[in-house]
């Protein structure tokens, strides 16, 4: 199922509500954001693994500012869908995760977060691959 850019889709799975969203302006922002993250990955050996060392969202890079604004909007959309009608305060914390061929991402959770999300700047072609992960034992 596909939705227009900027229109969130909500799915009630288990007691957890999932939200998917194609960010408006992603076609222009993603290449710029990818270049920025790849440069950061080259300059910082532990960028992907040392996620507590920095916060991507404090950057003043235009593509990161765009992503931060989109994430703030997504938090408001999610909270509204959950029926939260009062003012909510939050802090965005994020990091770039650059995976090369053969890399993997362990199953995990974020126990100190009331909301977690992932934004994929680029993904490889999945047309000829089988399921890349089984969630029979989710984190």
Regions found by a protein language model. Name each.
Residues 93-139:
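Catalytic core of non-heme Fe(II) oxygenases with the double-stranded beta-helix
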Residues 84-94:
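A short coil-to-beta-strand element that immediately follows conserved catalytic motifs
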Residues 13, 86-88, 109-113:
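A generic structural micro-feature
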Residues 2-84:
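Non-heme Fe(II)/2-oxoglutarate
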């Amino acid at each position: 199922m596909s939705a227009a850019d900027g229109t969130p889709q909500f799915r009630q799975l288990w007691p957890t509500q999932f939200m998917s969203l194609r960010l408006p302006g992603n076609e222009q922002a993603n290449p710029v954001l990818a270049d920025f993250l790849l440069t950061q990955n080259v300059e910082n050996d532990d960028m992907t693994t040392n996620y507590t060392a920095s916060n991507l969202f404090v950057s003043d890079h235009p593509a990161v500012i765009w992503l931060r604004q989109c994430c703030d909007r997504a938090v408001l959309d999610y909270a509204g869908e959950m029926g939260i009608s009062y003012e909510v305060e939050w802090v965005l914390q994020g990091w770039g995760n650059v995976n090369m061929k053969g890399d993997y991402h362990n199953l995990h959770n974020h126990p100190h977060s009331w909301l977690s999300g992932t934004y994929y700047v680029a993904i490889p072609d999945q047309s000829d691959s089988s399921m890349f992960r089984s969630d029979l034992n989710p984190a």
